[in-house]
A protein has these predicted regions:
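Non-Sec secretion/translocation targeting segments of pathogen effectors
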Residues: 1-2, 274
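Catalytic cores of nucleic-acid endonucleases
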Residues: 5, 53, 59-245, 262
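Selective for proline/serine-rich intrinsically disordered segments
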Residues: 25, 30, 38, 238, ...
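Poly-acidic low-complexity segments
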Residues: 41-42, 175, 256
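Charge-dense, extended regions
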Residues: 240-274
């Protein structure tokens, strides 16, 4: 089973369990729609009184090592990373992280410079189709070997840190503010990992009493803790292909571009709700 299929099935199962706990009194305003369906993954309106309705936006991951995004179509133009797939929410999140990571930008510039120097001076960006600047497919191999023998390594970023995780939190907070529904004056952003939940942010005049009552509605006897730190890992690299083909059966060389980021390490003080 593909990882993204399993993740969506787990998300649907978590939604169904929470929906059962909350009942008809607290209806869903957003349901699981699959990868790249937008923000939030799902959400419920908690009715604490006639004039006290609070939208709880929930971002869901099925494990503390869940992949948050991946792509094989990014490009680097010398100053920034981008992807032609502008509709993919997950890819845009990943691109944002890459462009806000100094190590990734510096190594992107290093590799682009090496491609210009050791492969072809007409190279203007790193991408999966970049070697096509040399029209003769079999002339690409010695040039790719020249690049491979002279560049330091293929890594662009390999970072695991709270700083990276906190960038994800900041990104979620930004999306949260942009996706508050008109006319809803109180909103809560929560993150759910497997069967545990944390509060990430609030908007409007949400009180401590409100937060306690929200936790009660979810079946918890204690208030949800705030998510203060999140550890994540970012991996970005390129990989030349075709260099190991035998001399008597040569193949055109190509460049693979890869990027992924995932959670790493379980946050503390989560509240089990399902």
């Amino acid at each position: 089973m593909a990882a993204n299929t399993k993740a969506f099935q787990d998300e649907e199962a978590a939604f169904a369990k929470i929906q059962k706990i909350l009942g008809k009194k607290h209806p869903a305003f957003a349901k699981p729609m699959g990868a790249d369906a937008g923000f939030p993954d799902f959400g419920f309106t908690i009715n604490l009184g006639a004039r006290n309705k609070i939208d709880v936006h929930i971002e869901y991951k099925n494990s503390h090592t869940a992949q948050m995004g991946s792509m094989r179509d990014w490009k680097f133009d010398g100053s920034k990373f981008y992807t032609p797939d502008t509709r993919s929410e997950a890819k845009q999140e990943l691109i944002s992280l890459m462009n806000n990571t100094g190590e990734a930008l510096n190594n992107g510039k290093r590799l682009l410079k090496d491609f210009k120097k050791y492969f072809h001076q007409g190279i203007t960006e790193i991408s999966s189709g970049m070697l096509s600047i040399v029209k003769d497919k079999f002339a690409r191999r010695p040039l790719t070997e020249n690049f491979a023998n002279n560049t330091k390594n293929y890594n662009i970023a390999n970072i695991s840190s709270n700083t990276l995780g906190n960038k994800i939190i900041t990104h979620y907070k930004t999306k949260f503010k942009k996706n508050i529904r008109p006319g809803v004056n109180k909103n809560v952003l929560a993150m759910m990992i497997a069967n545990e939940i944390w509060i990430v942010s609030t908007s409007g005049s949400v009180t401590n009493k409100d937060l306690k009552e929200i936790a009660t509605a979810f079946g918890s006897s204690k208030e949800f803790n705030k998510l203060n730190n999140l550890t994540a890992k970012l991996e970005v690299r390129i990989q030349p292909r075709g260099l190991n083909a035998p001399a008597n059966n040569p193949k055109p060389t190509t460049i693979d571009v890869m990027a992924s980021y995932r959670l790493q390490g379980k946050p503390v003080q989560g509240t089990k709700i399902i």
